[in-house]
Amino acid sequence: MSTLHHRLTITDLAALKGRQKIAALTAYSTPIARLIDPLVDFILVGDSTAMVAYGRPSTLAMRLDETISHTRAVVDCTRHACVIADMPFGSYQASPEQAFRNCAQVLSETGCDAVKLESNRALAPTVAFLVERGIPVMAHVGLMPQFVHVMGGYKAQGLTEASAETIVEDARANLAAGAFSLLLEGVAEPLARRISQQSQQPCIGIGASPACDGQILVTEDLLGLGGPQQPRFVKQYADLTAVIGEACARYASEVRQGEFPELAHCYGS
């Protein structure tokens, strides 16, 4: 973990490649962001907000105004971690100009440090357009949830020669376009290892390889708040579902039995 003297930048993240693994998590709200801020190198305000915070069926339902609201909340309560906003589906695919307009709005209204785009070769020119105009971009390749209907579901990528070649070409195109980092999701381990070793920019894995330059998980998943069915790549470090359930059950029981509040919890008593 890096020092707490300043908010980390994309330059700081790049400098960690080959020196120290990058630890990253998601956050959508002040309580979680404040807790993880001193512990991680960057926080992703993911489009997974749509599912985790709002209970929607997929990330496709995330809206731009929600991205701005949640990212601003995370930026306002953190001081250390680099904050990256995940651009929602439909906010950047139509044209480079649309992408710049929406990404610029996110950066200017939230104070975040960079944006993340799910980007294949076809969108690499958009990445270049953004970088040339001052917007740092992390490119997400491999399993891209915003492409779920095209990909036929949430399936691991790079398991066949053709799929692996597609991912390699997507990665190369985005790095050549100026992406400061790659996020490799659901990519076959040998392929993710090779891309990470060959890339001069940090490669962050989620369901990819321990050889990646860093790792990211959805915070609620590692805390046991993500529901009973989790992807293979999730490691649960705590079971807060049980802890929270027990605490709330005790509260409800004490209220119904007249045990809470006690006079110690009241004013003027």
Swiss-Prot record:
InterPro entries: Pantoate_hydroxy_MeTrfase (IPR003700), Pyrv/PenolPyrv_kinase-like_dom (IPR015813), Pyrv_kinase-like_dom_sf (IPR040442)
Gene3D superfamilies hit by this protein: Phosphoenolpyruvate-binding domains
Binding positions (Mg(2+)): D47, D86, E118
Name of one Pfam family that matches: Pantoate_transf
Similarity-based family: Belongs to the PanB family.
Protein name: 3-methyl-2-oxobutanoate hydroxymethyltransferase 1
Record's subcellular location: Cytoplasm
GO cellular component, one term: cytoplasm
Binding site for 3-methyl-2-oxobutanoate: D47, S48, D86, K116
Signal peptide positions (record): none
A Gene Ontology BP annotation from the UniProt entry: pantothenate biosynthetic process
Active site annotation, chain numbering: E185
Keyword Cytoplasm: yes
Oligomer and partners: Homodecamer; pentamer of dimers.
The species this protein was found in: Pseudomonas entomophila (strain L48)
Cofactor: Mg(2+)
Catalysed reactions, as listed in the record: 3-methyl-2-oxobutanoate + (6R)-5,10-methylene-5,6,7,8-tetrahydrofolate + H2O = 2-dehydropantoate + (6S)-5,6,7,8-tetrahydrofolate
Function: Catalyzes the reversible reaction in which hydroxymethyl group from 5,10-methylenetetrahydrofolate is transferred onto alpha-ketoisovalerate to form ketopantoate.
